[in-house]
Amino acid sequence: MHLTPRELDKLMIYCLAEVAHKRKAQGIKLNHPESVAVISAAALDGARAGKTVEDVMKDAATVLTRDDVMEGVPEMIPLVQVEAVFTDGSRLVTVHSPIQ
């Protein structure tokens, strides 16, 4: 199987997001890379599901709370940007203050 660099990036995001979801389900607080992966995967999934850019940004900002992550992580992530493929093409999705 041959994957483009972009496809490899998405695969890494999804793999780390799956690990993070398992840890979250076990009650383990997420670190910085895990948190970014979960937020990015939520944005990619929303775009793939046919949502608008605005809906994807709004939904991705609600997937994690301060209780889900280690201390200091929300301050380390002022925004998350990911290029997602929507029904009308690729767009850069920016999620501001993704951890409330």
Curated annotation (Swiss-Prot):
One of its GO terms (molecular function) is nickel cation binding. One of its GO terms (cellular component) is cytoplasm. It is found in: Cytoplasm. Pathway: Nitrogen metabolism; urea degradation; CO(2) and NH(3) from urea (urease route): step 1/1. Gene3D superfamilies: Urease, gamma-like subunit. Its EC number is 3.5.1.5. Keywords: Cytoplasm, Hydrolase. It catalyses: urea + 2 H2O + H(+) = hydrogencarbonate + 2 NH4(+). It is an enzyme of class 3 (hydrolase). Its main location: cytoplasm. Signal peptide: none annotated. GO terms for biological process: urea catabolic process. InterPro entries: Urease_gamma (IPR012010), Urease_gamma/gamma-beta_su (IPR002026), Urease_gamma_sf (IPR036463), Urease_subunit (IPR050069). NCBIfam families: PRK13241.1, urease_gam. Belongs to the urease gamma subunit family. Heterotrimer of UreA (gamma), UreB (beta) and UreC (alpha) subunits. Three heterotrimers associate to form the active enzyme. This is Urease subunit gamma. The gene is ureA.
